[in-house]
């Protein structure tokens, strides 16, 4: 385990070196399946970026959902939160553009229970010359997410959680099932969803990851 963790840290340090060497890069986009440790990876990468003299500033795509009344629905009439069209792409691109141009932006916080964005004057953001945006989400490799941002300003990374848990010598728990358990815990703690609601949405999550 310690060897695996050391190898991972080495790879993350190499990524930070690549990012720091590209002077035009203003944001790092981290993509991966739901509950695949993107947030944990982003924190580890942020530490390595600091070693290179860059201060990471995190923005979550989850705060840029459209209002609940505008959320697309799937073939069963249920809200489809996993499609990229559930995100307010115009606002997201506007904020990113203004940030890399040196402007100050009031970042929203999405209230999942009420289905609306909320704004707090204490959440205004401005990027200094030694700061870099770190953004993570399942759609971060999709050019539609950052369509207004020049290619040279973006550095994209894909990760996937491949940890295997064994029941015994012959049977294992799939990584998909492990991610589902993580998703159930996260949704309950941070989004106010019950385990049943997460299980009902899981097929939609899988579609959004493809």
What are these regions (language model features)?
Residues 93-153, 195-210:
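Glycine-rich phosphate-binding loop used to anchor ATP phosphates in small-molecule kinases
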Residues 40-41, 45, 60:
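Hydrophobic positions on the alpha1 helix immediately C-terminal to the Walker A/P-loop
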Residues 1-29, 51, 57:
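Extreme N-terminal, non-catalytic leader segments
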């Amino acid at each position: 385990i310690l060897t695996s963790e050391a190898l991972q840290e080495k790879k993350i340090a190499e990524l930070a070196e690549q990012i720091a060497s590209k002077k035009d890069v203003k944001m790092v986009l981290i993509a991966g399946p739901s509950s695949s440790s993107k947030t944990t990876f982003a924190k580890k990468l942020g530490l390595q970026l600091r070693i290179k003299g860059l201060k990471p500033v995190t923005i979550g795509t989850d705060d840029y959902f459209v209002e609940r009344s505008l959320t697309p629905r799937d073939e069963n009439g249920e809200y489809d939160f996993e499609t990229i069209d559930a995100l307010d792409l115009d606002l997201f691109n506007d904020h990113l553009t203004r940030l890399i141009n040196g402007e100050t932006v009031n970042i929203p916080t999405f209230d999942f229970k009420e289905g609306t964005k909320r704004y707090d004057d204490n959440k205004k953001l401005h990027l200094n010359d030694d700061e870099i945006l770190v953004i993570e989400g399942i759609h971060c490799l999709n050019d539609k997410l950052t369509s207004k941002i020049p290619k040279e300003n973006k550095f994209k990374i894909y990760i996937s959680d491949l940890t295997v848990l064994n029941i015994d010598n012959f049977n294992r728990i799939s990584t998909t099932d492990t991610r589902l358990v993580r998703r159930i815990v996260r949704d309950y703690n941070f989004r106010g969803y019950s385990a049943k609601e997460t299980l009902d949405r899981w097929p939609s999550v899988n579609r959004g990851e493809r």
